[in-house]
Amino acid sequence: MGAAAKLAFAVFLISCSSGAILGRSETQECLFFNANWERDRTNQTGVEPCYGDKDKRRHCFATWKNISGSIEIVKQGCWLDDINCYDRTDCIEKKDSPEVYFCCCEGNMCNEKFSYFPEMEVTQPTSNPVTPKPPYYNILLYSLVPLMLIAGIVICAFWVYRHHMMAYPPVLVPTQDPGPPPPSPLLGLKPLQLLEVKARGRFGCVWKAQLLNEYVAVKIFPIQDKQSWQNEYEVYSLPGMKHENILQFIGAEKRGTSVDVDLWLITAFHEKGSLSDFLKANVVSWNELCHIAETMARGLAYLHEDIPGLKDGHKPAISHRDIKSKNVLLKNNLTACIADFGLALKFEAGKSGGDTHGQVGTRRYMAPEVLEGAINFQRDAFLRIDMYAMGLVLWELASRCTAADGPVDEYMLPFEEEIGQHPSLEDMQEVVVHKKKRPVLRDYWQKHAGMAMLCETIEECWDHDAEARLSAGCLGERITQMQRLTNIITTEDIVTVVTMVTNVDFPPKESSL
């Protein structure tokens, strides 16, 4: 078995090396074209020099559309190292009837001519047809023989391995193929190119990527976290999930082979990132705080709402179960949108809510009943757990607000001052459940009329009694009312307005869930 594996590896290295030497073509420059040159502020056409790391290969690419037989070029230019472009001297699209045609190749100006040549069909040349070149029979022969030999060795080795493993139970949990990827608007749209890692989390990492002329976010899950990927896809695919304050879903895909699979979730990209990242680097004004808090509450209220009779079906109530500032993203105008539904529960009539295991989420944001393991497994109980965490996120906003007449604290996570950055479950139980502590509301916040009302609202969100917490809809109304009242306060009538504020009828304190 060991000798066979070594032989296979040696032959594989030889064949790969010979193939690379024979087929590799250095790309220094490519034909450049941009149909949207005025909007992108680039040249319309020209020659583009290709730059990149010395150990990376460079390619040319072309994208175009076929509109009723008329060829419209979208873009041409340089393309970064892509295994799908290796050793292609001609720029040919082989996919069957894509919406956007895409091809890539190696060699200077190789994208000057491009064509559409679907497999099993007759070539449909574009306005710039490629002149076919004579086949390289010798290269094919030298490449195929070692490949066939490798395939035979691998098949034999695999058969011996399986025969040997049948007698022994597996020690590790086997990697499972998630099956065919779900229907996705991205299947057939190229190119999608990963650019840089923006964040890492419990279930994978988030990349900034480029899809044709726009940036998108790609969340990549390892196969071990298939359940989280599947759950997030299912939640995004529910009827009525398109909302201004819920992260826009674009598609889901499976990438890689059956042995090495990554699961991709593609969403809108927001340059400002998460609320947590934003607050680390910025303070907020009172109006900015109100806008972020109100749009955040709107998103959660919509998520919690059960909405029958939509055009595309019935939207069930959904509990997020991992509300935190890292899972709230900010658009350029500071409008908030809720993200990350890997742990979410949907409450559909006549169906199980799925895995309702109580102690999930991020420890420092866990409600007292979650830390105690004393959850009532009903819909309203899960929605109230979200509201406790929302109270902590509002505290994070308040701690970085400049409205009050006092110093603005350095950004800290909830309970970081009391427990530190890496609390254990026992630490959280001691502070939250037994001592019933909450993050500190500064005394000088009470001197600002709006901040004083916000502090009262925060306390009603994180109330130890779950049934006394505000609902998300009530929270949104409170914040709207706070902003309206504080906006009319002036230097001349501040005493009058403060008197009015004390007589305002707030929405009921009890949860309306």
Swiss-Prot record:
It is a single-pass type I membrane protein. The keyword Oxidoreductase does not apply. The chain crosses the membrane at residues 136-161. The keyword Coiled coil does not apply. The active site is at D322. It catalyses: L-threonyl-[receptor-protein] + ATP = O-phospho-L-threonyl-[receptor-protein] + ADP + H(+); L-seryl-[receptor-protein] + ATP = O-phospho-L-seryl-[receptor-protein] + ADP + H(+). Residues 1-19 form the signal peptide. It comes from the Eukaryota. Keywords: ATP-binding, Cell membrane, Disulfide bond, Glycoprotein, Kinase, Magnesium, Manganese, Membrane, Metal-binding, Nucleotide-binding, Receptor, Serine/threonine-protein kinase, Signal, Transferase, Transmembrane, Transmembrane helix. Disulfide bonds join C30-C60, C50-C78, C85-C104, C91-C103, C105-C110. Residues 20-135 are extracellular. Glycans are attached at N43, N66. Gene3D superfamilies: CD59, Phosphorylase Kinase, domain 1, Transferase(Phosphotransferase) domain 1. Residues 192-485 form the Protein kinase domain. Its EC number is 2.7.11.30. ATP binds at K198, A199, R200, G201, R202, F203, G204, C205, V206, K219. GO terms for molecular function: activin binding; activin receptor activity; activin receptor activity, type I; activin receptor activity, type II; ATP binding; BMP receptor activity; coreceptor activity; growth factor binding. It is an enzyme of class 2 (transferase). Belongs to the protein kinase superfamily. TKL Ser/Thr protein kinase family. TGFB receptor subfamily. On ligand binding, forms a receptor complex consisting of two type II and two type I transmembrane serine/threonine kinases. Type II receptors phosphorylate and activate type I receptors which autophosphorylate, then bind and activate SMAD transcriptional regulators. Receptor for activin A, activin B and inhibin A. Mediates induction of adipogenesis by GDF6. This is Activin receptor type-2A. The gene is Acvr2a.
